[in-house]
């Protein structure tokens, strides 16, 4: 098998790859390194490579955080889900993940006891199929969100681009969202049933458990159960929201006293999010503008190579 390591081409990421190249030398194996050339390039590259080399056994290794993981996975799932007979029978392509410090790591939190920084542990690992959420023509591995969370993400991304730390950016993003995003008029249906009427604070549709670097939005979510976990906050007073935010961080918001009659949690296979206005849906931290989003779960759609468990 050949491994193709896909790394972010941004100049400010270069210093983080020194240890990566050292590990490649210490663990000889067939590999190539591809450096992305811009937004969406990881997805395009993986899709094109699969089209041109359908018979080749390859593991595409996403090197970084949520964004590049989503890009690489979207390329492979998009290829396998394209309707092409050869692609739909594809069983010789997988993805793996190498995490570099500083990148957002919401997705790999779902796999405790595994070292995502080690090439050696990745090579010794095994493949397991995980679910993927399809969102219109895009794909999500971890969490989709609208309302409060998307306001936090939007503001945080602006601040990170200006050089603020991820923690400071998200803290300030939360403050901004508290002041501006408590009464969103967005309609959510799950498996054909409207979740609630009236304004809402937020809604997350989750495959994994954590979003935004610190919010444990879906503590019961599993990546291989064929279901999405939907968490919905009705509009509420500022005081109640302030009481809920710490619980939302820790994953204790479901069934909590401040969340009574305000926090709704259920599972679904299909979800529709719609609004009369243009809104931003964030999937794996990436912005997707629109007014209607159709989400459905694709059970076992992504073959993911996980690092060897540290206890093995």
What are these regions (language model features)?
Residues 135-227:
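ATP/pyrophosphate-binding catalytic subdomain of soluble kinases
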Residues 10-11, 102, 207-210, 235:
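Short, glycine/serine-rich, charged loops/turns that create anion-binding
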Residues 54-55, 124-127, 179-181, 196, ...:
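Short solvent-exposed loop/turn micro-motifs enriched in small/polar/acidic residues
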Residues 5, 33, 188, 230-232:
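Generic preference for hydrophobic
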Residues 190-192, 197, 222, 232-312:
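ATP/nucleoside-binding phosphotransfer catalytic cores, i.e., glycine-rich phosphate-binding loops
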Residues 2-164:
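Small-residue-rich beta-alpha loop regions that form the catalytic core of phosphotransfer
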Residues 2, 138-139, 185-187, 202, ...:
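Structural motif
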Residues 66, 133, 152, 203, ...:
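A residue-level signal for conserved active-site and pocket-lining positions in enzyme catalytic cores
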């Amino acid at each position: 098998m050949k491994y193709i390591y896909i790394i972010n081409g941004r100049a400010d990421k270069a210093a983080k790859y020194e240890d990566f190249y050292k590990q490649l030398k210490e663990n000889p194996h067939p590999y190539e390194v591809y450096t992305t050339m811009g937004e969406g390039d990881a997805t395009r590259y993986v899709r094109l490579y699969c089209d041109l080399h359908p018979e080749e056994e390859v593991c595409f290794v996403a090197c970084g955080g949520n964004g590049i993981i989503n890009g690489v996975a979207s390329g492979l799932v998009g290829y396998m889900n394209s309707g092409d007979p050869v692609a739909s029978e594809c069983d010789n392509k997988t993805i793996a993940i190498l995490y570099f410090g500083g990148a957002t790591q919401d997705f790999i939190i779902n796999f405790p006891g595994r070292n995502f920084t080690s090439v050696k542990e990745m090579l010794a690992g095994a493949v397991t199929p995980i679910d993927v959420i399809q969102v219109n023509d895009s794909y999500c591995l971890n969490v989709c969100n609208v309302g409060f969370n998307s306001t936090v993400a939007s503001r945080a991304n602006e601040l990170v681009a200006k050089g603020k730390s991820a923690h400071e950016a998200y803290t300030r993003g939360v403050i901004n969202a508290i002041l501006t995003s408590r009464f969103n008029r967005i309609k959510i249906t799950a498996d054909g049933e409207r979740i609630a009427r009236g304004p809402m604070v937020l809604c997350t549709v989750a495959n994994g458990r954590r979003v935004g670097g610190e919010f444990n939005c879906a503590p019961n979510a599993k990546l291989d159960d064929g279901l999405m976990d939907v968490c919905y906050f009705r509009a509420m007073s500022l005081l109640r929201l302030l009481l809920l935010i710490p619980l939302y961080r820790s994953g204790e918001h479901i069934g909590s006293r401040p969340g009574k009659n305000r926090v709704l949690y259920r599972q679904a296979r299909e979800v529709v999010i719609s609004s009369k206005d243009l809104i931003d849906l964030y999937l794996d931290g990436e912005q997707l503008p629109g007014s209607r989003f159709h989400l459905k779960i694709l059970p076992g759609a992504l073959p993911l190579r996980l690092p060897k468990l540290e206890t093995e």
